[in-house]
């Protein structure tokens, strides 16, 4: 039987764009019970509820590296390109991202508007 502290979340993560909420059990770059994993960003992490393996976890979200919003990892809310960016910041700075990222954004279901200076005539 798991001890009480393993079941008690540290808090509840809430995405500031889609309002997804999820309890998180760790915040940081190296989740407990996963010795070989170091995340590339400070993340909100929950234990994987689908497996009894304590070393398995799910990354719920992180802060946007530009504006600081809490955003989930869902493709409608953020993307990771060396750092986490919320989609509003990506859209405001789209020309700072590589062409591949811009093409990926155009394929997403989220309405994406290219700046007038980059629209094809």
Swiss-Prot record:
Signal peptide residues on this chain, from the entry's feature table: none
Disulfide bonds: none
Organism superkingdom: Eukaryota
Family classification: Belongs to the CDPF1 family.
PANTHER family linked: CYSTEINE-RICH DPF MOTIF DOMAIN-CONTAINING PROTEIN 1, CYSTEINE-RICH PDF MOTIF DOMAIN-CONTAINING PROTEIN 1
Protein name according to UniProt: Cysteine-rich DPF motif domain-containing protein 1
Gene: CDPF1
